Swiss-Prot record:
SUPFAM superfamilies linked to this entry: ThiG-like
Name under which the protein is recorded: Thiazole synthase
Gene Ontology MF annotations: thiazole synthase activity
Catalytic activity, as annotated: [ThiS sulfur-carrier protein]-C-terminal-Gly-aminoethanethioate + 2-iminoacetate + 1-deoxy-D-xylulose 5-phosphate = [ThiS sulfur-carrier protein]-C-terminal Gly-Gly + 2-[(2R,5Z)-2-carboxy-4-methylthiazol-5(2H)-ylidene]ethyl phosphate + 2 H2O + H(+)
Chief location bin: cytoplasm
Highest taxon above the source species: Bacteria
EC class of the enzyme, as a word: transferase
EC number: 2.8.1.10
Record Pfam families: ThiG
Binding, 1-deoxy-D-xylulose 5-phosphate: G152, A179, G180, N201, T202
Organism of derivation: Erwinia amylovora (Fire blight bacteria)
A Gene Ontology cellular-component term: cytoplasm
Protein family according to the UniProt entry: Belongs to the ThiG family.
Encoding gene, per UniProt annotation: thiG
Subcellular location per the Swiss-Prot or TrEMBL entry: Cytoplasm
Length: 252
């Protein structure tokens, strides 16, 4: 489903901002996630220890270009990530607005085109804009990662109708909600809408109990997916009686 990989879990988890490496490891294991995102900014003085932890966890690593604001920065970071982690996967972020951390659509498409042409399998962090989505697919991306809300905001699905339109328009394209999810109920809602996965970080890393929150999100994402698969009833403006009137007592 995600390029050459079909995960059992639809929960993708970030690795930044945890209280300790031990809690990070416990949260990843509790989440059941098979894909974890990693920033090259972690590769400082303790980079070796962090890579050792990644090896121990035996998860699929999705490096990202977090913090990049230009095409050159993002492309250079992607090449470094491919060399360091020995993977063609890259979560492409090209930030265009400092306050909202909204992606720069023009730089994002250009960077995606360059990387896809060189064999990368790009996971683009984008918005719910349909035209931008089309341009990213034309550039060579095989999936899209629209935000639910600004990164780390915890606002959930801020533009539900826009996301519904995106899901409806890109029927056969894997769509992963990336950013803005703050509560398990929000993740379940996205899965009920038909999205293919949830990527989050802050909601688990900053929770009072990251282990418990990782478990809660795993359950919610699974429940939302199962509900969608089972077939949700249509919403109605008026009540519809669920109890049949046949056989009711007749009073005279």
């Amino acid at each position: 489903m995600f390029y050459d990989f079909v995960p059992q879990s639809r929960f993708l988890l970030g690795t930044a901002g945890y209280p300790s490496p031990q809690i990070l490891q416990q949260a990843i294991e509790a989440s059941g996630s098979e894909i974890i995102t990693v920033s090259l900014r972690r590769e400082g003085s303790q980079g070796g220890a962090f890579r050792a932890l990644l090896t121990q966890l035996n998860k699929r690593v999705l490096p990202n270009t977090a913090g990049c604001h230009t095409v050159k920065e993002a492309v250079t970071t992607a090449y470094m990530a491919r060399e360091l982690f020995n993977t063609r996967w890259i979560k492409l972020e090209v930030i265009g607005h400092a306050d909202t951390l909204q992606p720069d659509p023009f730089a994002l498409v250009e960077a995606a085109r360059i990387l896809c042409a060189d064999g990368f399998q790009v996971f683009p962090y984008t918005t719910e804009d349909l035209i931008l989505g089309e341009k990213l697919l034309e550039a060579g991306c095989k999936l899209l990662m629209p935000w639910g809300a600004p990164i780390g905001s915890g606002q959930g699905l801020r533009n539900i109708e826009g996301l519904r339109s995106m899901r409806s328009w890109f029927k056969d394209i894997p769509l992963i909600i990336d950013a803005g999810i703050g509560a398990p109920s929000q993740a379940a809602q996205a899965m009920e809408m038909g999205f293919d996965g949830i990527l989050l970080n802050t909601a688990v890393a900053r929770a009072q109990d990251p282990l418990g929150m990782a478990q809660a999100f795993a359950s919610a994402i699974r429940a939302g997916y199962d509900a969608r698969s089972a077939g949700l009833i249509e919403r109605r403006d008026m009540a519809t009686a669920s109890t049949p009137i046949f056989g009711m007592a007749q009073f005279s």
